[in-house]
């Protein structure tokens, strides 16, 4: 679960991490109140969306007067934000963050991440902050330092010394940096985060280390341990189908292909996506209905997949171990019989009550093609998806 910048900063403030004062506004009137509370004549106004690239895509405005700040608040709250991280979708802007300008002497990048290569949490740092870290990693890998962490939220003194030396922090900045890193690591572990990114972390001309921007992602599977974080979930920032899938308890991820997939089991679902790609096709979604879905849940899953206007072919791939193939068939038929414009459907059923399931579909008269081979089913689905 992604947090908005202001939510991430609220969390960091609770760990006594130094952040310039900020206020959040959802209207021009709230912007006026924010100006009074901050007592500033110039500042930065930033859209609050779950996407990066705000600065490059008009989502961040540097304002040099109170009237400019309010004009920026009004403008940004009216926009729908699009960047290369929104998958072509325009995200609504319901809040903006207002914060003072800072006298910056140096910018850094600092993050606590899940290092999948080494299978452990890690601190990642760079002396080049305020830029795309992916670009730095690709062009200047020597400017990045990755420090692995233990599973027990412990940061050793030698690791802190290694970081401080790499960042060239001296004097009082050494102490500030050491304390900041310890607090960020603690925050990461305490809240079951999968990402805690500070970009940029700045050194001011006054000699202070300040967090200017923060991005935090919480592990969805751990939210039951964090009810105060769970209520921060913002469904307006997600694909409508993703939100619906969560409400009905399905594991769904929207993709950009045209073959809608309904599969049981995450492993089989990923294999289905792979084999479609091998044969030149592209899935419109990942959808795992689970191992014991009911007829009602299958109906909801089919309706969810077909609600995507990009879906031109429906591919159902079920291995009925615990799952009843007849329930899958009944759920599919129930949805298809309510639709006027039916799309080609490829079905592969194996396992419990497979013959009954096939019979239910065949007697319904819906346009459906069966095959027992996963390879043949994928080839057929891809061929149908390219008929236009």
UniProtKB/Swiss-Prot annotation:
Cofactor note: Binds 1 Mg(2+) ion per subunit.
A single Gene Ontology CC term: succinate-CoA ligase complex
Residues reported in the UniProt entry to bind ATP: 46, 53-55, 102, 107
Alphabetized GO MF terms: ATP binding; magnesium ion binding; succinate-CoA ligase (ADP-forming) activity; succinate-CoA ligase (GDP-forming) activity
Keyword Nuclease: no
EC number from the UniProt entry: 6.2.1.5
Binding site for substrate: 264, 321-323
Keywords carried by this UniProt record: ATP-binding, Ligase, Magnesium, Metal-binding, Nucleotide-binding, Tricarboxylic acid cycle
Enzyme class: ligase
Cofactor: Mg(2+)
Limits of the ATP-grasp domain: 9-244
Biological process, per Gene Ontology: succinyl-CoA metabolic process; tricarboxylic acid cycle
Pathway noted in the entry: Carbohydrate metabolism; tricarboxylic acid cycle; succinate from succinyl-CoA (ligase route): step 1/1
Reaction it catalyzes: succinate + ATP + CoA = succinyl-CoA + ADP + phosphate; GTP + succinate + CoA = succinyl-CoA + GDP + phosphate
Ligand binding (Mg(2+)): 199, 213
SUPFAM superfamilies: Glutathione synthetase ATP-binding domain-like, Succinyl-CoA synthetase domains
Any Pfam family matching the protein: Ligase_CoA
Function description: Succinyl-CoA synthetase functions in the citric acid cycle (TCA), coupling the hydrolysis of succinyl-CoA to the synthesis of either ATP or GTP and thus represents the only step of substrate-level phosphorylation in the TCA. The beta subunit provides nucleotide specificity of the enzyme and binds the substrate succinate, while the binding sites for coenzyme A and phosphate are found in the alpha subunit.
Family stated for the protein in its record: Belongs to the succinate/malate CoA ligase beta subunit family.
Quaternary state and interactors: Heterotetramer of two alpha and two beta subunits.
Protein name: Succinate--CoA ligase [ADP-forming] subunit beta
Species the sequence originates in: Chlamydia caviae (strain ATCC VR-813 / DSM 19441 / 03DC25 / GPIC)
Source taxonomy: Bacteria, Pseudomonadati, Chlamydiota, Chlamydiia, Chlamydiales
């Amino acid at each position: 679960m992604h947090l908005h910048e202001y939510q991430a900063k609220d969390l960091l403030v609770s760990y006594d991490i130094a952040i310039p004062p900020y206020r959040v506004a959802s209207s021009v009137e709230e912007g006026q109140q924010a100006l009074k509370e901050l007592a500033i004549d110039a500042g930065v106004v930033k859209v609050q969306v779950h996407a990066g690239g705000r600065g490059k895509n008009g989502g961040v405005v540097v304002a040099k007067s109170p009237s400019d700040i309010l004009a920026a608040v009004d403008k940004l709250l009216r926009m729908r934000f699009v960047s290369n991280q929104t998958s072509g979708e325009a995200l609504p802007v319901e809040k903006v963050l207002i914060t003072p300008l800072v006298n910056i002497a140096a910018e850094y990048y600092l993050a606590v991440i899940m290092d999948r290569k080494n299978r452990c949490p890690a601190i990642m740092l760079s002396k080049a902050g305020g830029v795309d870290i992916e670009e730095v990693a690709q062009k200047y890998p020597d400017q990045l330092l990755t420090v692995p962490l233990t599973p027990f939220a412990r940061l050793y003194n030698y690791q802190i010394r290694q970081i401080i030396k790499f960042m060239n922090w001296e004097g009082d900045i050494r102490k500030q940096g050491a304390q900041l890193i310890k607090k960020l690591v603690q925050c990461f572990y305490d809240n079951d985060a999968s990402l805690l990114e500070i970009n940029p972390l700045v050194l001011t001309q006054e000699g202070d280390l300040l967090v200017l921007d923060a991005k935090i992602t919480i592990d969805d599977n751990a939210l039951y341990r964090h009810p105060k974080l769970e209520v921060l979930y913002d469904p307006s920032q997600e694909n409508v189908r993703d939100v619906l899938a969560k409400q009905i308890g399905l594991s769904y991820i929207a993709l950009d292909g045209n073959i809608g997939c309904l599969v049981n089991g995450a492993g089989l679902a990923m294999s289905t996506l792979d084999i479609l790609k091998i044969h030149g096709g592209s899935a419109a979604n990942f959808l795992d209905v689970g191992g014991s879905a009911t007829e009602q849940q299958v109906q909801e899953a089919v309706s969810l997949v077909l609600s995507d206007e990009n879906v031109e072919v429906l591919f159902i791939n079920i291995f009925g171990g615990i799952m009843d193939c007849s329930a899958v068939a009944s759920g599919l038929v129930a949805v298809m019989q309510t639709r006027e414009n039916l799309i080609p459907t490829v079905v592969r059923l194996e396992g419990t009550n497979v013959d009954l399931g096939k019979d239910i579909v065949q007697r319904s008269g819906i346009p459906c093609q069966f095959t027992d081979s996963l390879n043949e089913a994928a080839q057929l689905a891809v061929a149908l998806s390219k008929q236009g």
